[in-house]
Amino acid sequence: MALSFSLLMAVLVLSYKSICSLGCDLPQTHSLGNRRALILLAQMGRISHFSCLKDRYDFGFPQEVFDGNQFQKAQAISAFHEMIQQTFNLFSTKDSSAAWDETLLDKFYIELFQQLNDLEACVTQEVGVEEIALMNEDSILAVRKYFQRITLYLMGKKYSPCAWEVVRAEIMRSFSFSTNLQKGLRRKD
């Protein structure tokens, strides 16, 4: 799906805002971003959960990656970033754009893009660019494998409306888990 001019302009403005902002307030930023993303995901639902019960699937969400007791702030930021990047990639496909209302999907893209920018600024501030890749390989790999399972599920179900509904609910669940980690980090600060 080609992104509309207005969407691209909004992304440009949000990028500029992120670059110009100083400091990293992960708990505040991530909590608000997650809340907005969850609201948009809820609005995107087109069919009843009950009509898709037969399509439910356990994607094996890597809960250990989002356990607030095991992570330092920089590691958590890196895990959040990967989850949001993979969510953006998943919902940016041609098959995804056919499944959802275009206006809501554009708003969801913008929200995810804003969160990615905020998290990139935070992770760079917390640990520096060189250390990011080495620090969190296992957790990033776990998140990538999780999203690979989601993608394979969608392919196996031929991107059916119920398959997308199951995935939408799963992504909402994953955003809720990351919110719990964020709360744990707030208690540590």
Curated annotation (Swiss-Prot):
Q: What is this protein called?
A: Interferon alpha-16
Q: Which PANTHER family match?
A: INTERFERON ALPHA-16, TYPE I INTERFERON
Similarity comment? Belongs to the alpha/beta interferon family.
An individual GO BP term: cellular response to virus
**Where does the record place it?**
Secreted
| The entry's keywords | Antiviral defense, Cytokine, Disulfide bond, Secreted, Signal
Q: Can you quote a single GO CC term?
A: extracellular region
From which lineage does this chain's organism come?
Eukaryota, Metazoa, Chordata, Craniata, Vertebrata
Q: Which pairs of Cys residues are joined through disulfide bonds in the record?
A: C24-C122, C52-C162
Question: Where is it chiefly localized?
Answer: secreted
Q: What does this protein do?
A: Produced by macrophages, IFN-alpha have antiviral activities. Interferon stimulates the production of two enzymes: a protein kinase and an oligoadenylate synthetase.
What range does the record give for the signal peptide?
1-23
Q: Name one GO molecular function term.
A: cytokine activity
Q: Which SMART domains match?
A: IFabd (SM00076)
Q: Which domain of life is it from?
A: Eukaryota
